[in-house]
Amino acid sequence: MKNKKNYFIKWAFCLLLAGLLSFCLSDSFAGSSEVQAATSNSANKRFTGWKISGGKKYYYKNGKKLTDLHKIGKYYYCFDSNGVMMTGWNRIHNRFRYFGKQTGRMRISQTVNGRKINSKGVWTPVVVLDPGHSAVVASGYEPLGPGSSELKEKDTSGTEGVATHVEEYKLTLDIGLQLRTLLQKRGFKVVMTRTNSNVALSCIDRANVANKAKADAYIRLHVNGSDSPYDNGAMTLCTTRNNPYTTSLYRKNKALSEAVLDSYVAFTGCRKEYIWETDTMTGNNWSKVPTTLIEMGYMSSPTEDYRMQQPSYQKKMVWGIAAGIEKYLTDF
């Protein structure tokens, strides 16, 4: 009986010891996991360096993604609002900069795609704005293109608002001056073919302003007219692939026309017509730089004529054209 009692005491003691051991081990493992998690979180918060996720490159400093322009080591890099490393041409703080397609490093004191980047890593694009027509109309005729025997009028008086009676040359100048101000704020150098309506300029004269400036983009501002009051919307005009005067510029002219038209329509909400490829425009044929002519709307449409005189809508017109120019310059 005594042996049986001792047996039960030993058995109970073993169970108690096993329970205590199990509790200690589980508590120990839990503590170890918590320590590991805390250590991992602490390491992430302190992490500094590059990471690649989903094919996109990021840089972390003390566990946080960098955004904006930063110097890392010997080079400058730029990251968008989500922390993604940027490449190619970008406007950063109203300055155009180029970041290597593979490395993301900002280029300085180099020429990329014919564009000169200064020692501060800045390229200043040149845009020539040509507000169509004038109060003083250039008289006579001029060749359609270099070496052409076909002659066209040097200029015309343009159209007039059917509802507002505002002349085309006034609206194009108004938009041109507003556009100049916006582009200058965004880091562009802007040259105007005219800043008032008291000068007579032929289409060749206007193109030569762009040629002399070696413009990165030549924007000809016009407004359309039609026999029908129902026609409305915007279009752009560029030379054709087989233009005998500026064949080498076709791709750039087309890309500029697409970018400007798409952005203009997106900002204004107007109807998108089309890109008219034509070799009948003297100003386009004589240009030696990327060129587009935008018809911003129809002054023969009472609704569109009135709308284009509203300051709020003019702001959209200006922002749309500016966005198109920038898209062309950064994408092409």
Can you annotate each of these PLM segments?
Residues 169-185, 208, 212, 254, ...:
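Solvent-exposed, polar/charged alpha-helical surfaces in well-ordered, non-transmembrane soluble domains
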Residues 249-277:
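Active-site-adjacent substrate-binding region
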Residues 122-207, 213, 240:
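Active-site histidine-acidic residue metal-binding/catalytic motifs
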Residues 203-216, 281-287:
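Mature extracellular/periplasmic domains of secretome proteins
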Residues 124-125, 183-191, 213-218, 270-271, ...:
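Loop/turn elements at helix/coil->beta-strand transitions in domains of secreted/extracellular proteins
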Residues 7-125:
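Extracellular adhesion/carbohydrate-binding repeat motifs centered on closely spaced tryptophans
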Residues 1-6:
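N-terminal secretory signal peptides that target proteins for export/translocation
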Residues 220-228, 237-240, 272-332:
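Active-site-adjacent mobile loop/cap segments within catalytic or ligand-binding domains
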